[in-house]
Regions:
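Cytosolic regulatory regions of ion transport systems
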Residues: 1-141
């Protein structure tokens, strides 16, 4: 599977390390130091640039990518990157980390769920942790 990971922070690096054996990966980030660190750890192609820039996505191979995983530090960049990725490749599966809970409620959640905002899968670490703790409190033992 051809996967583009947008963001070379802790999550992006961990994903890249886990997936690099079985998949064709490209990691995109604006931080060249992070990318060099990743290159030293494993044999992964990297690209310096903005995650939501169409030319960077094209250079990363979006036209024939199977999946884009957007895990930058910016929710807005992650969402826009997924939107631009879908414009460039309608069949690509998009995954975005979304930390701000307000994006996952009301009209914006409806827009994501309906595909109006083309993010196929949105992952909110904060929401997952909150739900897990709430479950522990409600079902003790």
């Amino acid at each position: 599977m051809k996967i583009i990971i947008l963001g070379a922070g802790a999550v992006g690096r961990t994903l890249a390390s886990l997936l690099s054996e079985e998949h064709d990966l490209v990691v995109v980030d604006q931080d060249t130091a992070q990318l060099h660190r990743l290159e030293e750890e494993s044999d992964i192609r990297t690209l310096t640039g903005g995650a939501s820039y169409p030319n960077i996505l094209v250079n990363a191979g979006i036209m024939d990518a199977d999946m884009v995983v957007a895990v930058t530090d910016s929710d807005e960049t992650n969402i826009v990157s997924c939107m631009i990725s879908k414009v460039l490749n309608k069949s690509v599966q998009t995954v975005a980390r979304v930390r701000e809970i307000s994006y996952l409620k009301g009209k914006t959640k409806e827009a994501m769920d309906s595909g109006e905002i083309p993010v196929d899968i949105h992952i909110s670490p904060e929401q997952l942790i909150t739900e897990h703790i709430q479950g522990l409190i409600e079902i003790p033992g």
